[in-house]
């Protein structure tokens, strides 16, 4: 990123919206809009997230936005979307972000319904690596879900590409699904993230999305980084079968399911994936599998990504 692109509080040339060519609309975020843009001097293509100060103030989330900027600007990992810089004018705050050319994981989940196990293995491994990095920096993410994971180009060997392209037995839809095992998946949103400077520290703030909330957060109890382990388990479950593990049309029952850890497996799950999820979705935070053991689990060590498309 060009050196002159610095936060408005830093040194050097002050970044303004005039430094960018604004392209197509990419989507709507929690507190603003996202556009494709190009920084004019470097020609670097970025995602420009626009937050409106009036809305931030009306929602009383000034502190949350400041925390998001502070945390996101100071993390750097292959599985985390890069926040290059941010700046502001009288009415807006602008975040200059790495582009994710293949969009949100949630959009792909809506498109395909569910994913083959090797694809899920790749997604969860990438996300778990990012969580391991964050936890080592005493950062709790607190809002892991498909909407907050973006898809970028990964490393696909020529052998894989040739094999996929030469296989006339699969449709374009199936071909794209198989390719998903070779993309790179990155955490994108740090709106609910928090830095806890004390190792092993605990918090009580309720946040996140109900379907992924661990019991201790939902019930307003103190919690620690193990909250992200539970959410990772709920995400893994949803990617495999297409439905969150504790979901019910009635919110009251969803809450009961979470509190009692009541869920069941469909035929989509392998023995390894069942064991993997069961080790994360445990009522007691202290009993949940560690992020290091997650990355060593057999389910995340699958190497055959040329799987059949789920029916």
From Swiss-Prot:
Keyword vocabulary terms for this entry: ATP-binding, Cell cycle, Cell division, Cytoplasm, Cytoskeleton, Kinase, Membrane, Mitosis, Nucleotide-binding, Nucleus, Phosphoprotein, Serine/threonine-protein kinase, Transferase
Regulation (activators, inhibitors): Activated by cell-cycle phase specific phosphorylation. Inhibited by ATP-competitive inhibitors N-[4-[[6-Methoxy-7-[3-(4-morpholinyl)propoxy]-4-quinazolinyl]amino]phenyl]benzamide (ZM447439) and cyclopropanecarboxylic acid-(3-(4-(3-trifluoromethylphenylamino)-pyrimidin-2-ylamino)-phenyl)-amide (CFPPA). Inhibition leads to reduced growth, increased cytokinesis, microtubular defects, and increased ploidy of the cells.
CDD domains per the UniProt record, alphabetical: STKc_Aurora
Modifications the protein undergoes after translation, according to the UniProt entry: Phosphorylated in mitosis and cytokinesis. Activated by autophosphorylation at Thr-205.
Location relative to the cell: Nucleus; Cytoplasm, Cytoskeleton, Microtubule organizing center, Centrosome; Cytoplasm, Cytoskeleton, Spindle; Cytoplasm, Cytoskeleton, Spindle pole
Top enzyme category: transferase
Alphabetical list of SUPFAM superfamilies matching this protein: Protein kinase-like (PK-like) (SSF56112)
Function statement: Involved in regulation of the cell cycle. Required for mitotic cell division and cytokinesis. Based on its localization to centrosomes and spindle microtubules, as well as to various cytoskeletal components such as the median body, parental attachment disk, and anterior and posterior-lateral paraflagellar dense rods, may coordinate reorganization and segregation of tubulin-containing structures during mitosis and cytokinesis. May regulate microtubule disassembly by phosphorylating cytoskeletal proteins leading to their destabilization. Phosphorylates EB1 at 'Ser-148' in vitro.
Family: Belongs to the protein kinase superfamily. Ser/Thr protein kinase family. Aurora subfamily.
Name of the protein: Aurora kinase
Organism expressing this protein natively: Giardia intestinalis (strain ATCC 50803 / WB clone C6) (Giardia lamblia)
Organismal lineage: Eukaryota, Metamonada, Diplomonadida, Hexamitidae, Giardiinae
């Amino acid at each position: 990123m060009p050196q002159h692109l610095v936060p408005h509080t830093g040194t050097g040339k002050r970044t303004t919206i005039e430094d960018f060519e604004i392209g197509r609309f990419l989507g709507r975020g929690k507190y603003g809009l996202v556009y494709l843009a190009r920084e004019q001097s470097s020609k670097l293509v970025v995602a420009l997230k626009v937050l409106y100060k009036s809305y931030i103030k009306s929602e009383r989330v000034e502190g949350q936005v400041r925390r998001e900027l502070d945390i996101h600007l100071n993390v750097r990992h292959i599985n985390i979307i890069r926040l290059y810089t941010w700046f502001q004018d009288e009415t807006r705050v602008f975040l200059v972000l790495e582009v994710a050319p293949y969009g949100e994981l949630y959009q792909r989940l809506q498109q395909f319904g569910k994913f083959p196990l090797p694809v899920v293995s790749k997604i969860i491994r990438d996300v778990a690596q990012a969580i391991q990095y964050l936890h080592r920096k005493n950062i709790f993410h607190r809002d892991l879900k498909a909407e907050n994971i973006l898809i970028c180009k990964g490393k696909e060997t020529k052998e894989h590409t040739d094999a996929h392209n030469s296989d006339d037995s699969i449709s374009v839809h199936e071909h794209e699904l198989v390719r998903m095992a070779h993309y790179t998946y990155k955490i994108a949103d740090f709106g609910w993230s928090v830095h806890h400077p004390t190792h092993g520290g605990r918090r009580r703030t309720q946040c996140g999305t109900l379907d992924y909330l661990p019991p201790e957060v939902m019930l307003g109890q103190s919690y620690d980084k193990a909250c992200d382990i539970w959410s990772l388990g709920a995400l893994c479950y949803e990617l495999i079968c297409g439905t969150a593990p504790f979901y019910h049309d009635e919110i009251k029952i969803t809450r009961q399911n979470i509190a009692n850890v009541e869920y069941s497996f469909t035929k989509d799950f392998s023995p390894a994936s069942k064991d993997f999820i069961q080790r994360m979705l445990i009522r007691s935070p202290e009993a949940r599998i560690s992020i290091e053991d997650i990355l060593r689990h057999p389910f995340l060590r699958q190497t055959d990504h040329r799987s059949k498309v789920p029916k």
